[in-house]
């Protein structure tokens, strides 16, 4: 066993979810590579007399189920796991896929039904709102290949980003949170991007190892009807096992009225047509993890890239709620560092970030070199 899993499990139990005696915790492993960490979490949960429950989801089994399932089957599957989740006080989800095509051959229609009747019910409505939760990946050959690293090299990277000094990060985030809470107008200018929106009256929140590992975000949400202009994202992103790049959104009064993504424009618009809320924004956040510099086409890592922000179509964050509701929540990242084209972010006409670096004195501790 990799001894670093012991430290990671400890951080998850005591820092991320603050598990207590007699609490039910669901440890869910999606892909069997994550069992080593899951077993360590269960071991440490038992030490404090919590009640761990293990659920293993095999990607191939899920794929076969969805291919053959009726809409009613998917509805019943969601109801069953919803009832299980209602009994939990805590949740840790470990994802360890072995392929980019884990759900290959599943139709877009079935994936949309799964998102609507399973993901939205079990996770967005119950797990996110009513449990102490944290989700993470597990370092395996698949993630190493995606990152163009050796397995050992990726493991070293992984444990660095997951076990960063989150207490230091938490303190450094406070001035940004306070500034966002006082800000009305946000203006973002970058290649292919000229976007304005208001965050007035929407609470901001710090994320420092509590919901995601790796972590590092300060997030809020635009006032629902305030987004105007256009944005062109400069990272690849995956949704429903489809990889998108060069996504551009055009907004009028909060709504995405035009969406393009090279040859995947049709698929992009099908996702945005999931429901009315999918064409409105549910999150605006800064990525702040000092060890994550480049995209992996994996949201859990990419949304934490230092010198980046993400603007998220779909369901609003509970902590920063603008009232938008949707079955989707899709964090799409734009990196503002100079090597990615640069860019500027203004709060109430004051420049706060240029080329991925905070320039206000009170925010400079959040720059990558100061968080390591």
Can you describe what each PLM-predicted range is?
Residues 32-33, 97-99, 140, 202, ...:
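Short, glycine-/Ser/Thr-/acidic-enriched flexible segments
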Residues 188, 250, 345:
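Short aromatic-centered micro-motifs
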Residues 258-325:
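Dual-mode signal for accessory low-complexity, basic/Gly-rich regions
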Residues 217-260:
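Oxyanion-binding "anion nests"
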